[in-house]
Amino acid sequence: MENNYSVTIERKIEKIIYQAALALDKNNWADWFELCDDSFFYSITSFSPEISKDMTYFSGDKKELTGLMEMLPKHNTDHSPLHRHTSVYTVDVSDDGKTAEAVSSVVIYQNMLDGINSHLDSGESRLFVIGKYHDKFLIE
């Protein structure tokens, strides 16, 4: 049976994951980065059955990702909002209580505003991406 400390930590981690999803939905990068440690590292990967390997689309630390997010307003981007539906599957606190790992499912929907056929697509909700978050936490 888990002790109360571990359960409390697990609930706090779940809350952080959900706060992160809300911040990302609002494109509030500052609040999202505030949840991340300075040693934060982010990567986007997927498994390719054709080559039987993981493919990396992006990998970088907090400084690199912050720089990219600061440049977003200078680029022509699709302003159709993204909405994340996140479900935390597991939170595993290490035996020493100093770290934890979590796995969450994420489904992202896009509400169309713009596009090639904006007069047809506007207001439509589309499945944008599905995947999993694999998060690591430092517990202080």
Q: Which positions does each model-derived feature cover?
A:
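A solvent-exposed, acidic/Ser-Thr-rich amphipathic alpha-helical stretch
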Residues: 38-105
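Conserved aromatic-histidine-acidic binding/catalytic patches
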Residues: 5-8, 53, 121, 125
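Short, low-complexity N-terminal intrinsically disordered segments enriched in polar/charged residues
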Residues: 1-38
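Hydrophobic pocket/interface hotspot
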Residues: 20, 32, 65, 102, ...
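A beta-strand edge to alpha-helix "cap/lid" segment located at domain peripheries
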Residues: 83, 90-140
